[in-house]
Amino acid sequence: LFVASIDTHTLHALNAKTGRKVWSYTTGGRIDSPPTYYKGLILFGSADGYVYALRAGDGILAWRFRAAPVDRRMMAWEQLESAWPVHGSVLIQKNVLYCTAGRNMYVEGGIRFLRLDPATGKLLGETVMNDKDPETGEDMHLAYLKKTQGNNMPVAHSDILTCDGRNIWMRSQKISLDGKRLEIGLEKVEEQNPKDFHIFCQNGFLDDSYFFRSYWTFGRRVTGGY
């Protein structure tokens, strides 16, 4: 079993039968969610801005990649971490590792959407998702008002990535396998393609706020309200 101890920045490997610790590895920041197993490697991100690959058998570091554009730190929830943290759970799809670095598209230059070789850590591609419409180059808020109606805003917060086999999803934001944001504007409910239905949470899969009720949704997206 591979378990992340979030606030101690440590990943533990446990014997599934006895619970005995086999090895542990400590990073420079929080590990906010479980790691990903892939062909003998344990792959995960950390709030220190790096992606790690450990050998599953002994916890030895195979490679480490800095997903953050620069190694700059800040205080967050009483701990030091990167201005561009990486979620613990990374996505593997068609032998490519996908992850994001950053908190929000509107701060610190946006979110970095990265594609890595999971075996070597080699960078295969990077897309910066920021406050500009990728289709027109306009300010996203102004461009979005032209594409939709009502009190709605595009997805901007980072979250654990999911995949339906055809596209990648960050909350309800559709992203192509080569890192392009797709279908920025809203669609009419009756015209939404059922093939795009997926499980997401509008507040993020990692939201642990006690006083805010959030639900996992199976669909294409949700709209805002007043």
Regions found by a protein language model. Give the residues of each.
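Noncatalytic, solvent-exposed loop/strand surfaces
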Residues: L1-Y226
